[in-house]
Amino acid sequence: MLPALIIFCATYLFLAGAEVPFLKLDRPGGAVAGAAAMVVFRVLTPEQVYRDAISWDTIVLLLGMMVLSSVMARAGIFRWVGWVALRRAHSPTSLLAAVVVVAGALSALLVNDTICVMCTPIVVAMVEAANLPPLPFLLAVAFASNAGSVATLTGNPQNMLIGTLSKIPYAHFTAALALPAILSLACVHLVLRLAFREQLRERRRLDVDVPAPELHRGNAIACAGALVFVVAGFVLGYDLAWTALVGSALLLVVTRGPPREIFAQVDGVLLLFFAGLFVVTHGVAQAGIAERIFRGIEPVLGSDALQQTIRFGGFTVAACQLVSNVPFVLLAGQWVPHFADPHLGWLGLALFSTLAGNLTPVASVANLIVLELGGRHGKVPFFQFVKVGAAATFLPLVVGCACLLVERRLGLLPGP
């Protein structure tokens, strides 16, 4: 157990962003190094790593969704959607609402991190053309992509993990969390509108003459068809990973352009990060460490399902600030089956771990992407981000959690 414990602590130290002298490991590097150490120190055998540790379903699902998003970006769909939003916005506040709705909806259909990569440069160009302050709109992309992604199993990486671990059907998951996600988006818009009311107070009508971006109609139609095919497959209960992979493969066949350029936009580092985390977490489980951690927090959580949901939600928000949401969900996924109501526990974990990403700049990859891509407009001070992020975290959490518990009380939650 001791080697596994040391490797676990060292790995999660890197996941928390700690800097170790003479070591330049970042989060993905720390995860891969931890995975290798689990094998070197015989916590796991190579056969266990290949056969048991890595969730290939999650890796394949993430790969398929990233390829699908990449093809849609090359077709010009995201630029065209941004142009339509800018043309139809009549004021700064209506443009802010459009950014929240578009980022949230696209993140529910695709993967929020990818949406941030694709949409942030478009939003920057939009606000420059409209001569508007960029900060409210950049935060709208980050916060709304997190909030909107709550709604589906494919909205973000941690939801994909929850889907793999819990076996909750896509349709059941969305039926339970669609309304909390919509209400969370409304809360995000309200928070941003109040926080930046001085900058958005202009009453002038937006009249921006921006030429329409190039839209490859044939490829766009193929992308729309593939997206309908994939979502329909999800709803009908087909295997998520292979449905996404088949949909993306069909797009590669029917669209123009070399696949190499599409694959170049796939985040291979993220896939390696996931693989490393899977191995480290499996080693922790094999050594019994995860079970001991749960025994330590179990008395605090209580035995009632309602108590467990609320208290574990608070614990989740705090833990996600330390190690980010994906590593925490991998660890917490071993505890939820022991809850009084595991089905509610999985849904609560998805809600809390995702919305926790709005609290600090490092709490979610989506935040880091938006701040990096929008960085030429100046850095966002940490405490200014937290000031707005706290409201964009806790208000949606209170509203979303209350909605989820009311659904459970009324018997509206689909069964596991």
Residue ranges, per PLM feature:
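Hydrophobic transmembrane alpha-helices of multi-pass small-molecule transporters
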Residues: M1-S70, W80, L179-L185, H189-Q286, ...
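Transmembrane alpha-helix interface/packing and boundary motifs in multi-pass membrane proteins
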Residues: L13-L25, V102-V111, A142-T154, A232-G237, ...
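Alpha-helical transmembrane segments of multi-pass membrane proteins, especially transporters
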Residues: R27, A31, A35, M66, ...
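Membrane-interface elements of multi-pass transporters and channels
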Residues: L44, A75, R79, R88, ...
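Membrane-embedded alpha-helical segments and adjacent helix-loop junctions characteristic
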Residues: E47-L135, G268-D341
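Re-entrant/interfacial helical elements at transmembrane boundaries that shape
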Residues: V81-G82, T114-M126, L138, T152-S166, ...
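Membrane-core helix-loop-helix motifs of multi-pass transport proteins
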Residues: M126-E198, R205-V210, D341, W346, ...
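A small-residue-rich subset of transmembrane alpha-helices
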Residues: F273-F274, L349-E372, A392-G400
